[in-house]
Amino acid sequence: MRLPWERQPLFYRHDPSSSPSSIGYDGPRISPQFPVGPLREAVVGLAETPRRWFWQVWGCSNSRENLNRIGGEPCWVQDAEYPRCPTCDSVMAFLLELDSNLPTTDGGEWLWGSGGIAYGFWCDLCGVSGFLWQCT
């Protein structure tokens, strides 16, 4: 059986208070085979990215570049993959991406697959978020 997060993309509808509810998955709650602790709390800041980093190539970063971002253009591990909103069928806007190797509370690191990137998207018309990840 495939885990819910292996079915891509995952979609969530957000109510007026921003609380999410899953769209398209009503199966049982499943635990991962290799569980990992929650992400470690961190203080983050936003900074305008210099034009030089507008486009980044995942294959050239070698874990030396910050591939976590809000807005801008995604840094695709594979081919570009913009999901369509399951409610209105519009192409969803890119919202954010999170790179692998994020520290967890149990001393480990969070990996998207074998060390890829997770991408978040948003449909403002429907209040729907979409998430997918890519790895090699």
Tell where the protein language model's regions lie, with residue ranges.
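Preference for intrinsically disordered or flexible, low-complexity segments
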Residues: 1-136
